[in-house]
Amino acid sequence: MPIITLLTDFGLSDSYVAEVKSVLLSRTPGVTLVDVTHQVAPGDVRAGQYLLARSWQRFPPGTVHLAVVDPGVGTARRALAATAGGHLFVAPDNGLLSFLDRPQFVSIPVSADAAPTFHGRDVFAPAAAALASGKRLEDLGSAITDATHSPLPTPHHDGTAVMGEVLYVDRFGTLISNIPGPDVEPGVRIRVAGTDVGALRRTFGDAERGTLVAFVGSGGTVEVAVRDGSAARLLGVGVGAEVRA
């Protein structure tokens, strides 16, 4: 049974998600559709890349991942399909797929009757349905080697500490960094934008209510939260804030 995941910035107050799903369901009988999220902030390609990067490998090989965060829709930016790690991807050529390791890309032709403001429905969804139905990548377009590459920032060592930054803020106000948990020695204190958070704990539940706590989150990197509160709001920081271990 084919699986297609969906990640967009369309939100849920309009008909956009349903219109995309209508294409997928009508062209791929028996498909399972999985919503990763439709609540990416409008046009936030970096957030879309982060969420897709941490979720795609949870699915079985052969899954098709349809990702549409596309502030350049209708312009000269290309539409892409790709394969990597036994999975298939469909997305705009704006860096959304920069996390892939050794991908193969093709450029998908845009039909003349595609709505210039809704390639998610008229270009990307048909391509995802074709792949989920067994079409080969090369059947969808011409191979390219110059896809836009804008990877997420990586941490570095400055000689005394691991220096990273906040990659994403979740709906709880948790600050999710790019520092891998194994890079932090036991007892090392975590600082966010100059504020001392303390050493890593096992989980946010180990902290007192209303206090900051650092831990290794389910994505494998250092996170900073407030138990029963919002670290982003308490500290007044967001994506890009410095994290030091």
Language-model segments: residues:
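Active-site histidine-anchored catalytic micro-motif
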Residues: 3, 27-30, 47, 60-69, ...
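Conserved active-site and cofactor/substrate-binding residues in soluble primary-metabolism enzymes
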Residues: 15, 19, 28, 43, ...
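Anionic-ligand-binding alpha/beta catalytic cores of soluble enzymes and soluble regulatory domains
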Residues: 114-179, 183-184
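A conserved acidic, glycine/proline-rich C-terminal tail/linker
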Residues: 176-236
